[in-house]
Every structure is written in C-alpha cells, then in structure tokens.
A protein has these predicted regions:
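Alpha/beta enzyme core
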Residues: 1-171
C-alpha cells in the first residue's frame, strides 16, 4: 500500500465520518527517515486524519519526536506489529517471556516520553497490557490484548465470526 492510496481513503472516510477520530497508519517504508515520515504524515493530515500511527519503538522514537515537534499527533503501536510479522515468525503473541515483557514496558515508557499521544497494544498478554495501561500516561487501545486497556479495537470479521481461512482469535 502506498502513501497516496492511504491519503485517498483517509479523505473518503473524512467526508463520511466527520466526528470520529481518524488515524492513518504509516505504511511499511514510509517511516524510514523522519523526513519521509513527515511528508507522508502531512499528506494524511491534509486528507483529514487527526493523528498518524507508526509501529515500533527503538529508532522510531526519533521519528515520533520529529513529528510531534512539528505539531503532528502520533499514535504508537507496540506488541504484535503487523509490518514486522515476518521477523516475529508469524502472528504470535508478544511479551510472554519476561525479557520481552520488560522490553515492552521500556518501549511503552519511551514512546510516551517521545510524545506519542495514544498507544495501541496488539497481541500482548492481558495481564501485561493491563499493567502497561496502569503505568501509561497516555491512553491505550488493545487489539487482542485483554480488557484492561483503555479502549478496544474489534475487527468486524472477528466480531461476526467470519472465518477468513486463518486461525480464529481466542478473544
């Protein structure tokens, strides 16, 4: 998916959903540098997004700071980050082992400290997600991360029990 494709769809959603918070996801590769991320984010904001989402921490902290310093609200995404699924060896819950949980705790503190205004936790054990939420100065949204987050993403196909050929989620 290209930046232009997302900007087009953000504009369509913005026309139909005027009061909803619209968050546009930076596609794979669009956040390779702070400048590239900024260029994409500006397009999304101009199209009607209120915030941009990017996956991960580490080197992404510089990008979060860069965007926030330029008045672009950022949503960070930790845990099972779909753009990194090949590195994870598939769609697997993240943070089960103590070392991985400690890294998620550090990453959650770091993205909030860098200026992210919202944190998505995906595929994280429920107890860890609840602990991250309790310690977080910013709201958390869970995707398959238990009921302890501040809000939830529910995928329509999961909610309706529509099988797309993949293993059904346990939540």
């Amino acid at each position: 998916v290209q930046v232009g494709d997302i900007a087009y769809h953000v504009a369509a959603v913005a026309r139909g959903a005027r009061r909803a918070l619209k968050i546009a996801d930076l596609p794979f590769g669009a956040d390779a540098t702070p400048e590239q991320a900024h260029a994409a984010a500006v397009r999304f904001i101009q199209a009607g997004a209120a915030m941009v989402k990017l996956e991960g921490a580490g080197h992404k902290l510089e990008i979060i700071r860069y965007l926030v310093d330029r008045e672009i609200p950022v949503c960070a995404h930790l845990g099972l980050t779909p753009q990194s699924v090949l590195r994870f060896g598939g769609f697997k819950v993240q943070g089960r082992e103590e070392a991985a949980a400690a890294q998620l705790r550090a990453d959650a503190r770091a993205v909030a400290g860098a200026g992210a205004g919202l944190l998505v936790l995906e595929g994280v054990p429920a107890a860890l997600a609840a602990a991250l939420t309790a310690a977080s100065p910013i709201p958390t949204i869970g995707i398959g991360a238990g009921a302890g987050c501040d809000g939830q993403v529910l995928v329509l196909h999961d909610l309706l029990g529509i099988d797309t050929g993949h293993r059904k989620p346990r939540f």
